[in-house]
Amino acid sequence: MKLDRKDLLGLRDLSREETELILNTAIPMKDVICRDIKKVPTLRGKALVTVFYENSTRTRTSFELAGKYLSADTVNLSVSTSSVQKGESLRDTIKTIEVMGFDLMVMRHAMSGTPHYVARNTRMRVINAGDGANEHPTQALLDMYTIKEKKGTLESLKVAIVGDILHSRVARSNIYGLSKFGCDIRVVGPATLMPPGIEKLGVKSYYSLDEAINGVDVINILRIQRERQVSGLFPSLDEYAQLYMLSPQTLARAKDDVLVLHPGPINRGVEISSELADSAQALINEQVTNGVAIRMALLFLMMGGGRDEITY
């Protein structure tokens, strides 16, 4: 089956079948990255560019690595040293990149909806690598892949998303993705970090961590996004940690085999204790590995012409 769409801008409009296709395609991709020789010629002759207007370690690097593992020519545009700093408009930047012959652009931008604007104004395929507080589809896909790999299914799981829901594109994409599989999704955090009307997305909202994680299969911890916040949303990081930090002790109300996820980077001692972050229950490093596999799957499906098999 081919991923029959030009762009991947979010999970909200992605069907369950398309989601399953991406997750299933990531399985052989992970086999590739776990072997000694990781290079396959599948996308030889294709060209990929990453354009990040916000800082990134995991997403940008994993997309670059995914492209190289698939033999695509992969270029990272450094916005801080580009003509953007000379006042070049977004539209002109995108057109300049397009006429160089790139097939696909991976874009991150601080303003919600920017990748959608770009997709409407270029022939290149576009993958949204995070747009403001809107969506981060590939993060949610790698989270879902990690959960399915460990649990064997995504069907009807109980999932708690903890922390800064208001500013989190990761939370929104996870809600859109997991809801396709009938998951019981709970969001928990301070009232000032809970977006109004979040229940309209089919989730239950909580302000008590103990209540929210009672009997859950998965806990996805969100980073406190200090760079997006105005002052006064909560009294202090210390008070936030007292109420919402996950530690081995706070997991007592969850299931014994609960999975603990975090998109990174983590703020140790704020959202998650170092003891829990470094424990076997926390899948933070596995998420990073799976992120490469998911992004390889997307590049293959979007640039590989829909071939049924990977070329080894």
UniProtKB/Swiss-Prot annotation:
Quote the pathway field.
Pyrimidine metabolism; UMP biosynthesis via de novo pathway; (S)-dihydroorotate from bicarbonate: step 2/3
| InterPro entries, per the entry | Asp/Orn_carbamoyltranf_P-bd, Asp/Orn_carbamoylTrfase, Asp/Orn_carbamoylTrfase_sf, Asp_carbamoyltransf, Asp_carbamoyltransf_Asp/Orn-bd
Q: What keyword terms does UniProt attach to this protein?
A: Pyrimidine biosynthesis, Transferase
Q: What are this entry's molecular-function GO terms?
A: amino acid binding; aspartate carbamoyltransferase activity
- Source superkingdom: Bacteria
Please tell me which top-level EC class this enzyme sits in: transferase
The record's Gene Ontology biological-process terms are: 'de novo' pyrimidine nucleobase biosynthetic process; 'de novo' UMP biosynthetic process; amino acid metabolic process
Q: Name the PANTHER family for this protein.
A: ASPARTATE CARBAMOYLTRANSFERASE (PTHR45753:SF6), ORNITHINE CARBAMOYLTRANSFERASE, MITOCHONDRIAL (PTHR45753)
The cross-references to NCBIfam families, in alphabetical order and at most eight, read: asp_carb_tr (TIGR00670), PRK00856.1 (NF002032)
Describe, as the record does, how this protein assembles with itself and its partners: Heterododecamer (2C3:3R2) of six catalytic PyrB chains organized as two trimers (C3), and six regulatory PyrI chains organized as three dimers (R2).
Its name, as the record gives it, is Aspartate carbamoyltransferase catalytic subunit
Gene source species: Syntrophomonas wolfei subsp. wolfei (strain DSM 2245B / Goettingen)
